[in-house]
Amino acid sequence: MKKYLALALIAPLLISCSTTKKGDTYNEAWVKDTNGFDILMGQFAHNIENIWGFKEVVIAGPKDYVKYTDQYQTRSHINFDDGTITIETIAGTEPAAHLRRAIIKTLLMGDDPSSVDLYSDVDDITISKEPFLYGQVVDNTGQPIRWEGRASNFADYLLKNRLKSRSNGLRIIYSVTINMVPNHLDKRAHKYLGMVRQASRKYGVDESLILAIMQTESSFNPYAVSRSDALGLMQVVQHTAGKDVFRSQGKSGTPSRNFLFDPASNIDTGTAYLAMLNNVYLGGIDNPTSRRYAVITAYNGGAGSVLRVFSNDKIQAANIINTMTPGDVYQTLTTRHPSAESRRYLYKVNTAQKSYRRR
C-alpha cells in the first residue's frame, strides 16, 4: 500500500499544472495536466480513506497544512483559518509516542515549504531555530515555543491532559488539538511585511491589496497548495500567471515549484501579476476604484471573464465600465459574474483590504 500511495503522490510533483484561475488562455496540454492532477489527487484521497477510514480524509490545501508520516498513520493538520493544530495517529502500537514526536516537529518546523513533501510520508520536517509557528502558539504556561525542551514539555502536558480518542468503525484515532493565539493571522502577516513593501514599491501595487490577496488566498500559509496546483502565499499558478510574469520580465519558461514556494519570489510574482492586470489587461478602465474591483476579480477568474460580464468585445467592455460608477461596477461583478467563487472573492478581498488600510 505504501509503495502504491507513494507513486500516486510523487507524480504531481513531476507534472506542470495550471487552471483557468489567474489566466484565460486555453491550452490543451494544460487541460491534460490539470485532469491528470485531479486524478492523482483523487487517488490520494482514496488511499488515505483506505488507510484512515470513511470520512477521515484530510488533504493539504490553500489554508490547510497537512503532513503525513509513519507510513501515513500519523498526520499533522494546521488549519490557518480556524487557528487550530490537530495531531492525529492511528498507530496500533505506542500511539502516544507517535503523537509526541509529531507535536514536537510541528511546533518547531521551519518556514521552507520547498523542503517538505506534503504528498508523501517521508519525515522530512527539520527542527528550526526560528520555528514558523513561534508566537502563533503558546504552551500551557503561556510562553511561546522556540526550543525543543519547551516543545517536549508541552507535548507531555498535552498527552496527559488533552489526549482524545475516537473510533470510526475501522480504526481508533488518537488526537490532540492545540489552539493558536487569537491574533495568529496578524502574526503570520507580519512575517511578510518587508517582502510586501518591497514588491509594492517595485510594481506600484498598494500594500493593502497585496496583503488582502494573501489573506484571502492562503491565510498567510507559505505551504499553500490547491487541487488546481496553485502554489504558495499568493496561490500563483505556474503555467498561467507565472508564465505571463516570466514573459513580461524577459524570462523563458515558467517558474518552478521551488521558486513559487519561496515566499519572497511568490509575493514578487503575484504582485507583478496584479500590476499586469492593472496596467495591461484591464488598463482601459479609467476609474482607479472600478479598475481595482476588476483586478481583484480577475486575479481569481481571469481578466477575460471579467470583461465578458459587460461585453464579449474587450474594448466595448472597458467603454461600458467607464460609463458606470465604481459602486455599479462592484454590484455587477458581485452579482453577474458567472463564477460564484469570483463573486465571493471580490467581496472577501475588498473587505480584507479595508481592514489593512485602517492599520
From Swiss-Prot:
It is found in: Cell outer membrane. A lipid is attached at C17 (S-diacylglycerol cysteine). It is an enzyme of class 4 (lyase). It comes from the Bacteria. Its EC number is 4.2.2.n1. One of its GO terms (molecular function) is peptidoglycan lytic transglycosylase activity. A lipid is attached at C17 (N-palmitoyl cysteine). Residues 1-16 form the signal peptide. It catalyses: Exolytic cleavage of the (1->4)-beta-glycosidic linkage between N-acetylmuramic acid (MurNAc) and N-acetylglucosamine (GlcNAc) residues in peptidoglycan, from either the reducing or the non-reducing ends of the peptidoglycan chains, with concomitant formation of a 1,6-anhydrobond in the MurNAc residue. Keywords: Cell outer membrane, Cell wall biogenesis/degradation, Lipoprotein, Lyase, Membrane, Palmitate, Signal. GO terms for cellular component: cell outer membrane. It is a lipid-anchor. GO terms for biological process: cell wall macromolecule catabolic process; cell wall organization; peptidoglycan metabolic process. Murein-degrading enzyme. May play a role in recycling of muropeptides during cell elongation and/or cell division. Belongs to the transglycosylase Slt family. This is Membrane-bound lytic murein transglycosylase C. It comes from Escherichia coli (strain SE11).
